[in-house]
Design a protein with these regions (language model features):
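Residue-level marker for beta-strand->alpha-helix junctions and adjacent short loops that shape enzyme
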Residues: 3, 42-43, 85, 148
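Generic alpha-helix detector with strongest preference for long hydrophobic helices that associate
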Residues: 6, 10-13, 17, 40-41, ...
Length: 167
């Protein structure tokens, strides 16, 4: 799923998107002018109401499956390709631009609305996940579906995805 491709502590990491996601991530998608989506299904837990999802963005959707492109969200630039090949090809055209104002705004969202739960006198799922975060530098984490899946997605700190990460 790509979770961990950008380390949780990386300054550009904004968290998960959607109804169980981070405020900063949801705001970033809601305010962005360009959204790259790589292998994303755009299910309703991510998009919410389709008419209000990424309303200002041109959406680029990369997926190896033709049927996935524009299935749930109409995209502006459909790319049917292997993700690695598509990204490497697009990198040839990247130029620098001033992103300081945008990154400052995202950092402000992260600071004002961190993903955290209030401490309780009893053991909580977050306490278990905090322990995993402290004990293991790198772990492969698997969950079943349910609330524990959401707690894990929200609070697990990942440094790599199957040993691979974006620097």
């Amino acid at each position: 799923m790509g979770r961990g491709a950008i380390a949780t502590k990386h300054p550009l990491y904004v968290g998960n998107l959607g109804m169980h996601g981070a405020y900063a991530c949801n705001m970033a998608v809601g305010e962005c002018d360009l959204l790259f989506s790589i292998g994303t299904r755009f299910n309703d837990r991510i998009t919410g109401k389709l008419h209000s999802f990424a309303p200002h963005a041109q959406i680029v959707h990369i997926d190896i499956d033709t049927a996935a492109i524009s299935k749930n969200v109409q995209v502006d630039v459909p790319i049917v390709a292997d993700a690695k090949e598509a990204i490497l090809r697009m990198l040839e055209y990247v130029t620098e631009c001033d992103t300081k104002k945008w990154l400052d705004e995202v950092e402000q969202w992260k600071g004002e609305h961190p993903m955290q739960m209030k401490k309780k006198p009893i053991m909580t799922p977050q306490d278990v996940i905090d322990t995993i975060n402290r004990v293991f530098d790198e772990a492969i984490v698997v969950t079943d579906v349910g609330q524990h899946q959401m707690f894990t997605a929200q609070f697990i700190e990942l440094n790599a995805c199957y040993g691979k990460k974006i620097p």
